Regions:
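N-terminal "domain-start" segment that seeds a small globular fold
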Residues: 1-26, 51
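Conserved helix-turn-beta segment immediately C-terminal to the redox Cys motif
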Residues: 31-32, 48-72
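Extracytoplasmic/secreted envelope proteins and their assembly/folding machinery
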Residues: 50-57, 82, 86, 103, ...
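Thiol-based oxidoreductase modules, predominantly thioredoxin-like and allied folds used
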Residues: 65-80, 95-104
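Short, internal strand/loop/helix patches
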Residues: 86-132
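Short loop/turn microsegments at loop-to-beta-strand junctions
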Residues: 10-11, 33, 132-134
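Thiol-/selenol-based redox modules, centered on thioredoxin-like
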Residues: 123-170
Length: 170
């Protein structure tokens, strides 16, 4: 994991979750959040990372499990509607949250979290998106705290996550 020396305020944002509810900074407060930027038509990195995050969450216990949420933010809002995300994200874990919104709002949010993405040009409607596979960690104040860089390792990520939480609780 790469810890930010000083956790960073992510600014204001207003997106929509896969239930059609508002997803804004208030939704990140009071618990730890793991954010992954992906898209439902992604052939490899996204399903692999979502399955990994489900395994990770299953390994947590007690308060760790209770106050950790996982969010997948779509980098393909043109195809990833609320309905599309509702059929995709809960497949990995019914507690996971899928988020979409206007392209510029998502781009601004991704930029604040150092997770760039771009559409691969010249593929018509069957396009791919180049995107970061980092998993961002947001602290209970709603600030960008750290990120995990692939290849993700379950045992290492668990130990690191616990350490970060212990330091936070001091």
């Amino acid at each position: 994991a790469f810890l930010l020396q000083t956790p960073r305020d992510m600014g204001d944002f207003r997106l929509t979750d896969h239930h059609g509810e508002v997803f804004d900074p208030a939704r990140l407060e009071g618990q730890w959040t793991l954010i992954f930027f992906g898209f439902t038509y992604c052939p490899d990195i996204c399903p692999t990372t979502m399955a990994f995050l489900n395994n990770f969450i299953q390994q947590l216990e007690g308060t760790e499990a209770a106050d950790t949420q996982v969010v997948m933010v779509s980098v393909d809002p043109a195809r990833d509607s609320v309905e599309q995300l509702a059929g995709y994200v809960p497949f990995f874990n019914p507690e996971f949250i899928g988020v979409t919104g206007e392209f510029l709002d998502i781009h601004r949010f991704a930029t604040a979290l150092n997770t760039p993405f771009r559409k691969v040009p010249g593929q018509g409607t069957d396009y791919l998106i180049d995107h970061s596979a980092n998993v961002v960690l947001v602290n209970p104040r709603g600030d960008y705290h750290a990120f995990f860089k692939p290849p993700l390792d379950l045992a290492k990520m668990k130990v690191t996550y616990r350490s970060i939480r212990v330091l936070w609780d001091r």
